Structure formats: C-alpha cells, structure tokens
Regions:
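Glycan-recognition and catalytic cores of secretory/periplasmic carbohydrate-active enzymes
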Residues: 1-362
C-alpha cells in the first residue's frame, strides 16, 4: 500500500507539477490539483526534494528522469541558494534572488543531505565534498545557529532540541563521506542530548527546549512539547541503536514513542496534537490542536521501525490506530497526494498539497 502510493501517486504528482523548467529547482506551493499558487522557493524544501529524487535513484531504481529532477534542485541550491560563506538562504524568488537571509541552519542540513545523496547517485566526488563542507559549517554554527540574525537576547538562554535531533539523522546520511571518528563523535553527542537532556526522566516525554544545564524552564518555550518532533527523533535513535547493536537504546526509544503517543493522542477526535503545553496551560501556538500530515507520517515510520526491532504488540496496536486515522483523513483519492493540514475534528483546513513547509519529502 505505502510503496504503491509513494511510487504511483505521490512522486508522479510532484514530477508533473513541481518542476521549474525555466529556472531550475522546484515549485512547492501547489493547490489541491497541483496548480502553482506561489513561485517563491524555500530552501528546506528544495534540499528535501533533491534528496528525495537522489534517494529514489539510489535505492529504488536508477531512472535517468529521477537523476535529472534531482540535478535541477542541486544546481539551483549550489548556484543560487548559498551565500559567499557557503550558508544556505532560507528562501529565494523563482529565478534565484535571495529573499530571506541564511538565518535557518536547517536549510543547510537539508542541502547537505541532498548534496551527499546526489554525489552518490551521480558518482560525483565534488558534491560529496560539498556535502562534507556544508556539514562542517553546520557544526561550526551549532552553538549559535542564527548568528547575527538571532533576535533573542541572552536574558533567558535556552537550548533547542531540534539541532541534536537533526544531527542524529544527518550524520548517518553522510556516514560514507565523513571520517569514522567524526561520525561516532556526533552520534555520541546527539544520543546524549536527545536521550539524557531533552527526554524528561520523570514524564518520559521530550521537551523542545531546556536551560543550558538541562533543567526545565517554566515559560512558553520551556513548557513546549512538539509530539511529532519527539517521535521522529525516536526513529533516528532506533537507527543508531541498530547500527550499534544497542538493545537498551532500542527499548528506551520504543518506550518513549508510546509515552508521547499516550500523552498527545486526541481521545475525542483522534489524531495527534501538533503542539502541547507540558503543564496543560494554553499553548502559545494558536494552531496547537491542528492535525498535521508530517506528524502522523513520522509516527508511522517510528512505529514501523520500533515494531521491526521489538515485535511489541502495544506498538502494533498503535500502528493500526495511526495508520487508520492517517489514511482516512489525509489521503486525497480524487486529485492525488495527501492533504497537510486538518482542524482538530479531522476536517481539511487547507486543501493545498504543498506550500512553505509541505513538500515532496513530507
């Protein structure tokens, strides 16, 4: 079902509608039928789509068409998407004029992933080197990722979960390109941060921010929970644990998936809440109760990986529950692809198939 839907529905939708044949790169703002409603290019999604088509070429079938689509995005990122220091802009116009400065380090993370996979697909050492260079630049920036674009003061310093989380996945993507000791060092750092700092020992759930010493902060950001993020990180942990044959980490990650799901599942309408406040206060995010496609897809990946390693019946039951909700509410059999944004009751809130944050990758 999933393979068929991916290869015969989702990927063809993006092949048909997203390619900018004039400027290169991809249009991601697509309405329900696939028509382009905005031509700006967001570098998170350019990198992710280039990675996706490179990975399809490497792991599913070496179709020349997939490699060409990947190259279109790769060339756009390399020639238009980076500043003189190699930092990746956040967004550009259709023809490649920078719109938003390179304040968001995740643009760089997805570009590095894309360069690495494309380098393998095209057997191009130059892109492997560019992936490595971009990765090392990310490490250099990790303690102050926004640099001069940081708008916060130092009055309430908080550490963010997002970077160690993405590094735990990025380093495995770049494993063949990086020095082995660099890979192990980054994995050690990421696992320590995710499982010992941001995973709260008392509640068993993941917080988005902590104080620099790892303690919890009683503020909007300090109480913030993003269930989809926490669950996604657990499948990164499972991948690392399998690589290291670490049963303890597999079991802890599996247990954490269940804890987060128990906390964040909407018992009234079904689905997983987008944001929550750890103390049950009103969340700062007005969209807190929406149901998002990526949250449910990442949860299905995490549950599938956890079940593969544990055969735990509780995981199987959760998988069925999330699977049934997702296919019932997000899939669009009429026009293809999936809806991204539902209200709390599970009704389509925006009928777009792509936008600033939703793309071909998820």
């Amino acid at each position: 079902l999933y393979k068929d839907n991916l290869l015969n529905n989702v990927i063809p939708f993006w092949e048909r509608h997203s390619l900018d044949r004039t400027n290169g790169g991809y249009f991601t703002c697509l309405d329900r039928e696939g028509k382009v409603y905005d031509t700006d290019k967001f570098m998170w999604l350019q990198g992710r789509q280039a990675w996706m088509f490179s990975t399809l070429y490497n792991q599913v079938e070496p179709k020349e068409n997939w490699l060409e689509i990947a190259k279109s995005g790769i060339d756009f990122i390399r020639h238009k998407g980076m500043d003189a220091q190699g930092n990746v802009y956040f967004s550009l116009t259709a023809n490649g004029q920078p719109l938003v400065q390179p304040y968001n380090i995740f643009s760089d993370c997805f570009a590095a992933m894309a360069f690495a996979q494309y380098g393998i697909a095209a057997e191009d050492q130059e892109y492997k080197e560019l992936a490595k260079k971009t990765y090392l630049n990310i490490l250099q920036r990790k303690d102050n990722p926004k640099g001069k674009y940081e708008k916060g003061t130092l009055a309430r310093p908080l550490k963010s979960f997002a970077l160690p989380m993405i590094l735990s996945n990025l380093v495995l993507e770049l494993e063949d390109i990086l020095e082995p000791n660099e890979v192990e060092r980054t994995i050690d750092f990421a696992v320590q941060e995710v499982m010992e700092v941001f995973l709260d020992g008392k509640s068993g759930i993941i917080y988005e921010f902590t104080k620099p010493d790892g303690s919890l902060e009683d503020s909007f950001n300090g109480r913030l929970l993003n269930p989809g993020h926490g669950i996604e990180a657990m499948w990164f942990m499972i991948d690392i644990a399998v690589r290291r044959n670490d049963r303890e980490l597999i079991n802890k990650a599996t247990e954490t998936i269940v804890k987060i799901l128990e906390y964040s599942w909407d018992e009234e309408y079904g689905g997983i809440f987008y944001f929550m406040d750890s103390r049950g206060h009103p969340p700062q995010q007005l969209e807190w109760d929406q149901k998002l496609w990526w949250v449910h897809l990442e949860t299905l990946v995490a549950l599938a990986k956890a079940y593969e390693q544990t055969q735990n019946p509780e995981i199987s039951a959760w998988y069925t529950k999330v699977h049934d909700y997702s296919w019932q509410h997000f899939s669009d059999p009429q026009h293809g692809e999936w809806f991204g944004y539902l209200n709390r009751r599970g009704e389509v809130l925006l009928n777009l198939k792509g936008g600033k944050w939703k793309g071909c990758f998820h």
